[in-house]
Amino acid sequence: LTCVTSKSIFGITTEDCPDGQNLCFKRRHYVVPKIYDITRGCVATCPIPENYDSIHCCKTEKCNN
């Protein structure tokens, strides 16, 4: 499985997930109004949202774009 790790105006950076990590995730952490810190990558299980986080998990190639 290939997941997106970062995204910018120059394109996306991806990683091949290691064995046992068969989900891609995208975490949006609320910082201030209209500003989010976004983290992407591979995980074995979908993380539980904390505080002001929004988490999306998926199982297809680059689905966390």
UniProtKB/Swiss-Prot annotation:
Q: Describe its function.
A: Highly potent on various alpha-adrenoceptors (ADRA) (subnanomolar affinity for ADRA1A). Order of potency is the following: ADRA1A (Ki=0.37 nM) > ADRA1B (Ki=10.47 nM) > ADRA1D (Ki=104.71 nM) > ADRA2C (Ki=165.96 nM). Were also found to reversibly bind to muscarinic acetylcholine receptors (CHRM), but the affinity is much weaker (CHRM1, Ki=1778.28 nM; CHRM4, Ki=4466.84 nM; CHRM2, Ki=17782.79 nM).
Q: Which PROSITE patterns match?
A: SNAKE_TOXIN (PS00272)
Give the disulfide map: 3-24, 17-42, 46-57, 58-63
Misc. comment: Negative results: does not bind to muscarinic receptors CHRM5 and CHRM3.
Q: Which GO MF terms does the UniProt record name?
A: toxin activity
Q: Which UniProt keywords apply?
A: Disulfide bond, G-protein coupled receptor impairing toxin, Neurotoxin, Postsynaptic neurotoxin, Secreted, Toxin
Localization terms from the record:
Secreted
InterPro entries, per database record? Cytotoxin_Cobra, Snake_3FTx, Snake_toxin-like_sf, Snake_toxin_con_site, Toxin_cobra-type
What Gene3D superfamilies has UniProt attached to this entry?
A: CD59
GO cellular component labels: extracellular region
The protein's name? Adrenergic toxin rho-elapitoxin-Dp1b
Expression across tissues: Expressed by the venom gland.
Sorted alphabetically, which SUPFAM superfamilies does this protein's record hold? Snake toxin-like
Q: Which sequence ranges are marked TM in the entry?
A: none
Q: For this UniProt entry, what is the primary localization, expressed as one broad class?
A: secreted
